[in-house]
Amino acid sequence: MARYELIKDEIGSIAKYVPGRSIEDIVKNYGLEPSSVIKLGSNENPLGPSPKAVEALIANAQGISIYPSADARELVDAISEYTDIPAANIVASGPGMDGLLDGLARLVIANGDEVVITTPTFSYYEIAARANGATTVYVQREKDFSINVDKLLAALTPNTKMIFLCSPNNPTGNVIPEEDILKIATATDALVFVDEAYVEFAEKNIAHLVLQHDNIIVGRTFSKAFGLAGMRMGYGIMPEWLREEYMKIATPFNVSTAAMAAGIAALSDTEHLNKSIELTVKGKKFLQEELPFKVYDTQANFVLVDVAPHKARDVTTELLKKGIIVRDCTSFAHAGLSLIRVTIGTKEQNEKVVKAFSDI
């Protein structure tokens, strides 16, 4: 028997996740100086982490030889205070929110189940679901990237186990109205997962709905507004009944001692968080006004740019040659061939982006 035959049948047809390009990759491929490259393809915080988080990492460095608490209780308590949600409804996850997605998929999805995904959106939902035997049902968003709730509800069947929603959506930046989420959740027994990775940049959040509906889950991350992408840490807000079941299959010690220390400190640093949000708001306005292509409105820390009649792949390549890393959205299902996602950077970075796009 060939060794690859040991791999589950479900894995063979799954497309590998496409990450944003790294600075090291661009330096190697284009012969650029690392200091000249700006990374605006992965929606990281251009201000970096909270100084308090860095201090906490240093202060706790000697403790990394000891296992952290199995359920990340200290971090969960800090998240509870930050969100005003009871700790009994919160799980910390690693690596990142992806760990939460993997855990939920292992918990509820089996062969023959279906999951509904509104595209274009974050591609890891599909990977986590299909790896556990699910069939993916796509519901394509409207031209303005809003969700047609009636069309989504029509896609549900008795086999639907999970519905994945992203708000603000990646890569489009728009939010799903609370009333639409409620309409979906009350019309099904399936779990409704709402990805709020970018919620700190949005006007509202829907975490409170978890306390009112027993099939809504909210996923969040420390990778964006909190500037801790390298720590790979997220969390889930879910009904108590689901948390009790989730903890049965959660990977033990899945949030490291270092990550917990940094996360707790970052949650306490409202000054750094507010600076990050303020920088994003100002940068968004500048890019929307100055970029010479159509820019969609956003409640995230990135803008979506339609470079038609050019191809996103061609424009992205030209920008890479100039040391500007952005995200070609061609790999997102149903995103088309002309969309580019640009992380909102510092004033200087944004000005460089506008100049580069203007030269296209």
UniProtKB/Swiss-Prot annotation:
InterPro entries: Aminotrans_II_pyridoxalP_BS (IPR001917), Aminotransferase_I/II_large (IPR004839), HisP_aminotrans (IPR005861), PyrdxlP-dep_Trfase (IPR015424), PyrdxlP-dep_Trfase_major (IPR015421), PyrdxlP-dep_Trfase_small (IPR015422). Pathway: Amino-acid biosynthesis; L-histidine biosynthesis; L-histidine from 5-phospho-alpha-D-ribose 1-diphosphate: step 7/9. One of its GO terms (biological process) is L-histidine biosynthetic process. Keywords: Amino-acid biosynthesis, Aminotransferase, Histidine biosynthesis, Pyridoxal phosphate, Transferase. Its cofactor is pyridoxal 5'-phosphate. The modification N6-(pyridoxal phosphate)lysine is found at K224. It catalyses: L-histidinol phosphate + 2-oxoglutarate = 3-(imidazol-4-yl)-2-oxopropyl phosphate + L-glutamate. It is an enzyme of class 2 (transferase). GO terms for molecular function: histidinol-phosphate transaminase activity; pyridoxal phosphate binding. It holds the Pfam family Aminotran_1_2. Its EC number is 2.6.1.9. Belongs to the class-II pyridoxal-phosphate-dependent aminotransferase family. Histidinol-phosphate aminotransferase subfamily. This is Histidinol-phosphate aminotransferase. The gene is hisC.
